[in-house]
């Protein structure tokens, strides 16, 4: 889950340390920690808790580099594996020689493989890590023991034993494709096809509840209706159903959302269109509940009405969780020609988060949105295609799983949600290398047909312009329709524009300078295009290259044309350079003060423009703006108070005397304690962005000797990491209770945590139970907003590509991410330090109330941190405490948990955030994850050219931060006027235990595990 990413390395290191122990040495707390991590992994989501706990006892952790072969085809297996991170290629050879092996698919996160160890059959394929990967490994003896003990749980979870399929053996043959219910590739899907043949119990119950609620509260909605001289019995109208649902619950925010919720019932046949159409519409169309299909449909009893009142909100919550997926399926089931612009945008947004498509350009993804087809199959065992057939389609799994089967070898692997297969068929004409068989009922796929995909690629290539020098590409442009309406006004021909796909840094800069439009009416459009370059240039063209290039472009003189033409060109060229410099300086702001090259360039550039302005009146508009920026940055840099000192405590709590927190800059100095092996310490004073090498030098000066010193960061659980000499800004990357140690390398193993790192021994419930939940949420939001506002957009870029590559600090981002962990552990700490059961119940209520108020204030970061704290295993296992929580609060918590649902790449959260207007504090770990996803899924350089499409995607994500902050956070007047100093101080100085093992032990002491 994303939160594990947010907690940086501590929580992950914790569970890995537990797995590294020998099974006999693992305590119940170790198992709890491993269990918490594994239950969020896709491969284990359907495993029974008892089985998963046994896996926690016997599993091992493996971290493998790219290119490692786990086993070869024909080997006798000794281990079963599950993929926790990364991906692996499955290679098969007809001759059993690895030289001619063909990659038939890729195993992604959540995939499990290796069941052949149950009967010692040879491995059917070679498995090679595609990238750095994390695996869970279970040895053969342990896996067989699990199989014997939990066969009833595992039988439906592991790949079915198809056995060896020898050629000519009738018994071993895969079911014939003609005998399986399969939608033919080129037969258009009709929306009338139902997705499930039998409605699920949950959906049946939901339909009954909604029907009873309507009959109880608005009985006029269900009645006989006449239309075109025909009578339709006991029907509702689509628009009325949407109106009614919006009125019933606060969890429905739009008509589109309500449509999706009714679509859930329609897909399962619990609600039906009178003409059997299968997509629900917010129109004057007639729909009938399943119960009303009967002539003698009963009216609800008083007992049923009472049950309905109790269950209605839970039903609404269930449908609101299922609605987005149903709405997406509804769109995908429309024939491509019937999809609206809004439909295409929804599909495109979904495609952005599918790893299998991450390497494709924006244009290709948008084109795919128009041709993707939804395909579903009700029965496990259905053959999607057979080995040896012509490949005509590429599939992406939306729901369910499939087995990859090869004749003579059986099941070689299983693919799950998010994995793809059949892609080779789109790029060559080779026959299918394997058969694909559904391993469970009700599987959903996205399908791309070869003809459509090849057409898209042909169109893209036809619209691609390649500029060459010395027979080498130096700039690749793509022709796309102009996005703004102004470009098309008064012109019968649709306007075209060119976007940069890739190029050398110099040619990319040259292109942007040449295409800057100087007309005032086009300022906004020009700024938007330039923004990608000025935000991302640090990745491929640092200021040491950019500044000289800008000077050269500014002074460039054309060699051809009349004197007037040359003068006009030179003038406009200079104005374009000034325009880019203004936006560049505005983006970087006071970060430029830390860059000597940039400061020298700005001063030199200002002098050049000032000289030219005396002779050219056209510069009169731009000069004052440039002068203002240069003076502001120069004066700030020279101000004596500029270098404010940052104390150790400030990293956690901020300066209580200051009215507002100020951003930390790399040149700011920090007073920091570095500890020795005997827990004595020396205080050093270095810049925040100092490298580890500089930290060692400062420590050596204090200690009198630096011979063989290393710098180690250690968390409260004793996890130690030796820092590399080129690591920078290490002070803010520590965990909440982490500390820095300095010692000779030979003393590394003897380092132990400080007693103070253990955290508090008594809770603060006595203090904050007297504070209003709304006051606490308000002050938390005020502080979080200050932290969030201090984060510069470029820190996101430095964090994504590695700050050591830029020698820049990400201190403000680090502290904001640490705040998430601090609030999360604050919740767990307070609950685990509360020994009285009734007080713990009150604590749960308090935290749920605070979370609700944070959500009202649009502080999604703290909202998620609190909810994740409540879902921490040390809290969630306290069954006696949760049993006594009133049902109203349980419902609130269930609704909050539903927003944390990580499925479909956190779609529940994304939909919620998309409905909110700024100001907004986002769930920052997910934004970081999105940028990392784009970075890792796309190369920075392609054929020695900068992949600018990747730069554009990352810049687009980073820009959401600017959007969230585009409106100021206006404090609640009623809250701001209160005497809030105590609450303000409390939320800024949280004291927590961040050792999961300690928290689990405390939890077990509060409520020992039931026998």
UniProtKB/Swiss-Prot annotation:
Keywords: cAMP, cAMP-binding, Cytoplasm, Exocytosis, Guanine-nucleotide releasing factor, Membrane, Nucleotide-binding, Repeat. 3',5'-cyclic AMP binds at residues 422-425, 432-433. Signal peptide: none annotated. The keyword Nucleotide-binding applies. The keyword Cytoplasm applies. Residues 496-634 form the N-terminal Ras-GEF domain. It comes from the Eukaryota. Residues 772-1009 form the Ras-GEF domain. One of its GO terms (molecular function) is guanyl-nucleotide exchange factor activity. GO terms for biological process: adenylate cyclase-activating G protein-coupled receptor signaling pathway; adenylate cyclase-modulating G protein-coupled receptor signaling pathway; calcium-ion regulated exocytosis; hormone secretion; insulin secretion; positive regulation of insulin secretion; regulation of exocytosis; regulation of synaptic vesicle cycle. Coiled coil: none annotated. Expressed in cerebellum, pituitary, adrenal gland and liver. Residues 216-291 form the DEP domain. It is found in: Cytoplasm; Membrane. InterPro entries: cNMP-bd_dom, cNMP-bd_dom_sf, DEP_dom, Ras-like_GEF, Ras-like_Gua-exchang_fac_N, Ras_G-nucl-exch_fac_CS, Ras_GEF_dom_sf, RASGEF_cat_dom. GO terms for cellular component: cytosol; hippocampal mossy fiber to CA3 synapse; membrane. It is a peripheral membrane protein. The N-terminal nucleotide phosphate binding region cAMP 1 has a much lower affinity for cAMP as compared to cAMP 2. The DEP domain is involved in membrane localization independent from regulation by cAMP. Interacts with RAP1B, RIMS1 and RIMS2. Probably part of a complex with RIMS2 and GTP-activated RAB3A. Guanine nucleotide exchange factor (GEF) for RAP1A, RAP1B and RAP2A small GTPases that is activated by binding cAMP. Seems not to activate RAB3A. Involved in cAMP-dependent, PKA-independent exocytosis through interaction with RIMS2. This is Rap guanine nucleotide exchange factor 4. It comes from Mus musculus (Mouse). The gene is Rapgef4.
């Amino acid at each position: 889950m994303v939160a594990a990413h947010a907690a940086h390395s501590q929580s992950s290191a914790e569970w890995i340390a537990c797995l590294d122990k020998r099974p006999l040495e693992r305590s119940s707390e170790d198992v709890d920690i491993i269990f918490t991590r594994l239950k969020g992994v896709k491969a284990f989501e359907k495993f029974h808790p008892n089985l998963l706990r046994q896996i926690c006892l016997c599993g091992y952790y493996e971290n493998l580099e790219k290119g490692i072969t786990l086993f070869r085809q024909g080997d006798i297996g000794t281990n079963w594996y599950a993929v926790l991170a990364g991906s692996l290629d499955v290679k098969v050879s007809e001759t059993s020689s690895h030289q001619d092996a063909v990659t038939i698919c890729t195993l992604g996160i959540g995939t499990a493989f290796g069941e052949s160890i149950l009967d010692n059959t040879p491995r059917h394929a070679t498995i090679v890590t595609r990238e750095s990967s994390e695996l869970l490994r279970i040895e053969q003896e342990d896996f067989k023991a699990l199989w014997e003990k939990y066969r009833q749980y595992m039988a439906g979870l592991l790949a079915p034993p198809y056995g060896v399929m020898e050629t000519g053996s009738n018994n071993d043959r895969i079911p014939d494709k003609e005998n399986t219910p399969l939608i033919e590739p080129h037969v258009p899907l009709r929306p009338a096809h139902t997705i499930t043949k039998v409605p699920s119990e949950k959906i049946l119950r939901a339909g009954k509840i909604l029907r009873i609620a309507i009959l109880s509260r608005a009985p006029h909605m269900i009645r006989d209706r006449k239309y075109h001289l025909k009578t339709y019995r006991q029907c509702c109208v689509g628009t009325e159903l949407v109106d009614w649902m919006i009125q019933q619950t606060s969890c429905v925010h739009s008509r589109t959302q309500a449509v999706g919720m009714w679509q859930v019932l329609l897909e399962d046949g619990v609600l039906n269109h009178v003409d059997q159409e299968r997509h629900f519409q917010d129109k004057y169309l007639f729909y009938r509940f399943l119960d009303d299909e009967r002539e003698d449909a009963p009216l609800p009893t008083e007992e049923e009405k009472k049950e309905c009142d109790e269950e209605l909100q839970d039903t609404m919550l269930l449908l609101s969780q299922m609605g987005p997926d149903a709405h997406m399926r509804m769109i995908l089931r429309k024939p491509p020609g019937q999809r609206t612009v809004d439909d295409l945008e929804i599909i495109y947004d979904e495609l952005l988060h599918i790893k299998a498509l991450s390497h494709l350009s924006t244009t290709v993804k948008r084109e795919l949105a128009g041709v993707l087809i939804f395909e579903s199959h009700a029965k496990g065992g259905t053959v999607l295609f057979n080995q040896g057939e012509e490949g005509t389609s590429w599939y992406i799994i939306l729901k369910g799983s499939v087995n990859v089967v090869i004749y003579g070898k059986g099941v070689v692997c299983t693919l799950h949600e998010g994995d793809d297969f059949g892609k080779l068929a789109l790029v060559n004409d080779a026959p299918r290398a394997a058969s694909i068989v559904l391993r469970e009922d009700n599987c959903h796929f996205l399908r791309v047909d070869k003809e459509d995909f090849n057409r898209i690629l042909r169109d893209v290539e036809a619209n691609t312009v390649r500029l060459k020098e010395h027979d080498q590409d130096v700039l690749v442009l793509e022709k796309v329709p102009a996005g703004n309406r102004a470009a098309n006004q008064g012109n019968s021909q649709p306007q075209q524009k060119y976007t940069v796909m890739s190029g050398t840094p110099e040619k990319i800069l040259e292109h942007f300078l040449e295409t800057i439009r100087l007309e005032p009416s086009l300022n906004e459009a020009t700024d938007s295009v330039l923004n990608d370059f000025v935000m991302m240039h640090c990745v491929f063209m640092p200021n040491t290259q950019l500044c000289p290039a800008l000077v050269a472009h500014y002074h460039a003189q054309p060699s051809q044309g009349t004197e007037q033409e040359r003068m006009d060109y030179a003038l406009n060229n200079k104005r374009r350079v000034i325009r880019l410099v203004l936006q560049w300086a505005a983006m970087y702001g006071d970060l430029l003060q830390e860059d000597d090259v940039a400061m020298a360039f700005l001063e030199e550039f200002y002098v050049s423009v000032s000289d030219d302005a005396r002779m050219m009146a056209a510069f009169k508009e731009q000069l004052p703006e440039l002068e203002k920026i240069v003076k502001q940055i120069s004066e700030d840099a020279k101000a004596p108070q500029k270098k404010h000192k940052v104390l150790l405590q400030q990293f956690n709590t901020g300066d209580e005397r200051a009215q507002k927190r100020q951003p930390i800059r790399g040149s700011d100095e920090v007073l920091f304690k570095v500890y020795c092996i005997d827990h004595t310490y020396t205080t050093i004073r270095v810049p925040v962005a100092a490298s580890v090498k500089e930290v060692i030098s400062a420590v050596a000066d204090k200690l009198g000797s630096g011979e063989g010193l290393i710098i180690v960061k250690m968390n409260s659980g004793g996890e130690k990491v030796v820092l590399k000499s080129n690591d920078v800004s290490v002070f803010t990357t520590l965990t909440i209770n982490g500390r820095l140690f300095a010692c000779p390398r030979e003393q590394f193993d003897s380092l132990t945590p400080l007693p103070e790192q253990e955290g508090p021994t008594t809770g603060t419930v006595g203090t904050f139970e007297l504070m209003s939940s709304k006051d606490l949420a308000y002050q938390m939001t005020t502080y979080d907003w200050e932290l969030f506002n201090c984060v510069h957009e470029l820190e996101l870029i430095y964090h994504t590509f590695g700050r050591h590559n830029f020698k820049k600090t990400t201190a403000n981002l680090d502290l904001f991410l640490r705040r998430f962990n601090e609030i999360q552990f604050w919740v767990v700490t307070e609950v685990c330090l509360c020994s009285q059961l009734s007080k713990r119940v009150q604590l749960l209520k308090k935290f749920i109330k605070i979370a609700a108020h944070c959500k009202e204030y649009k502080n999604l970061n703290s909202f998620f941190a609190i909810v994740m704290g409540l879902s921490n295993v040390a809290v969630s296992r306290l069954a006696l405490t949760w049993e006594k929580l009133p049902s109203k609060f349980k419902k609130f918590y269930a609704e909050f948990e539903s927003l944390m649902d990580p499925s479909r790449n956190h779609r529940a959260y994304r939909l919620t955030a998309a409905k909110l207007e700024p100001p907004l504090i986002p769930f920052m770990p997910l934004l970081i994850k999105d940028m990392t996803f784009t970075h890792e899924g796309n190369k920075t350089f392609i054929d020695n050219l900068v992949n600018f499409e990747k730069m554009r995607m990352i810049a687009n994500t980073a820009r959401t931060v600017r959007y969230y902050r585009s409106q100021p956070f206006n404090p609640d007047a009623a809250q701001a006027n209160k005497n809030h100093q105590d609450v303000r101080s409390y939320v800024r100085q949280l004291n927590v235990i961040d050792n999961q093992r300690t928290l689990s032990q405390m939890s077990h002491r509060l409520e020992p595990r039931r026998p």
